[in-house]
Amino acid sequence: MSIFPKISLRLEVENYLKAGFMNEEQFNGLSFPILQHPDLQDVLLIPVIGPRNNIKQQPCEVIVGAQCGNAVLRGAHVYVPGIVSASKFMKGGDVVSVYSDIKGKCKKGAKEFDGTKIFLGNGISELSRKEIFSRLPELKGVGVRMTDPVYLSPSFDNVLPSYLFLQNLPSAVVSHVLDPQPGEKILDLCAAPGGKTTHIAALMHDQGEVIALDKISNKVEKIKQNALLLGLNSIRAFCFDGTKALKLDMVKDTDGEPPFLPESFDRILLDAPCSGLGQRPNMACTWTLKEVTSYQPLQRKLFTVAAELLKPGGVLVYSTCTVTLAENEEQVAWALKTLPHLQLQRQDPQVGGEGMLGAGLSSEQLKRLQRFDPCVVPSQDSDTGSLRDARIEDTMWLANKDCIGFFIAKFVKCKST
């Protein structure tokens, strides 16, 4: 979770969070420790508590889709569009057990479901079954308010939206590795939904220019909304395909709009489209081999464009939220061979582990990479007692490791192309 817009923890922000999320009465006797990351001064950590295995399952059931289930595991309530099925006699105010249909087999509107499902916890239904499946377009709000989830993570819905932005820890690390400076011109080549874009602008103290590209128009609008909400004026977002961002005819610049002339940017973030195998939680593993292997060529196209758009002496950071060798270390090896004007650099801060063997990189090169791999963390339950009693060093070690799968590489362009 990053703090905006200044790179310091405002006392009133920290106190507000502690008052809310350490309120044991509100959270049924539980409290959430709030920790400042020792290496990232603008990041607060709030651990997830669970799994909580003593929750009594109820006869009245609500079935949700896998994506909705993922959101519930991260602290969200159940919104009406995510509800697939509900028990026949469910009324507003009933205590219900919520399950995720991880295989997508439950039919919309079913009155019962005996297929594969994962228990997410209990909540209070806000609406009756009849109201939920009435197909009224205005029914988009909360359908079940989660009161006793298996994984307890506080909801940040409308919590200081002009000060905070929720991120996974590695996503916050990326912008620090890029190290944008006030007055620079920065490109976020694949920017949606804008968490890293806004973080970059905040790190620059909103001084300079941050260009954000994405080829899907509604995602670009989301970037603009986030920038407006956080009071950041240095961001310009465009609906544009990053693979076509390089202007080839060498005519005069187009008033700062894409495509761009070569060597236009001081720093570039390429948070590339990827297979997303590092995302957590994820209860819907629907990828085919064809899909998983389709990203490498696209990433290389974007890599080539980014290298051309970078000024000599400029910094390029490549990142993904996946764990495959092909999309990470192999891409670094390919870039060093194909784009010899790029040099692999050490990273600061170094929060994750080093790179993985198998792509032909030297041990020194692997040490210059950051790989976040939750597989290295032993499975364990967490509760407020264990978190309260743990040493701060152990808690931080766990926070740095027990996160999403992620990869970061940093390059400097040593000469003009």
State each model region's role.
Residues 105, 195, 276-277, 325:
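Short glycine-rich, flexible loops that bind phosphorylated cofactors or substrates
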Residues 16, 151-158, 162, 245-275, ...:
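C-terminal catalytic and target-recognition region of SAM-dependent MTase-like enzymes
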